[in-house]
Amino acid sequence: MQDNTNDKELVLQAMREYGRSKAAQLQEASAEMTGTELYAQEQYIPDFQAAKAAMNMSQRKLGENDGFLCRSTAGHVVRLIGSYDSDVWPGEPETLLSQWKFVWAKDPKKARPFLALSTSPYDTGDCCTYPAEDETLHVYRSGKDGNVWPPRTLNVQWTDLGPVGGPYIEEDA
């Protein structure tokens, strides 16, 4: 019987190289992509903790639209907009809000927990999750650009699409 260990290692190595290549291509193309497109490719967006371990954030590319892209442990896709020493400040992007621009998706299945951030407001169609009146987690869609107010705030345009996990109510259905 033949030992397939070498074949298995070759396949794993090829898969890792493919993943690294796709991740690098995504970083390059991300400036032209929407939040929805980025979340659809999130398997190629590096985990924040792994990225921080590989290279200090002070050495990563900064940019409002083309800065380094990663995914927080909470699942938010974020872009580095402010330099900082991640050895000194090791916290997740949710704890260093001025260093990161959060990216939102219009796909309700990719909605992430609501964050009130003036640096990363929700635009028309962007989705988030937030507790409904009965305290169950629902998906909400922003009805205006520059929205920094949480869903269910009086006189703020959000549409309740239903409980997390769907099915989701679509306005044009």
Roles of regions detected by a PLM:
Residues 2-173:
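Tryptophan-rich substrate-binding surfaces of secreted polymer-degrading and adhesive proteins
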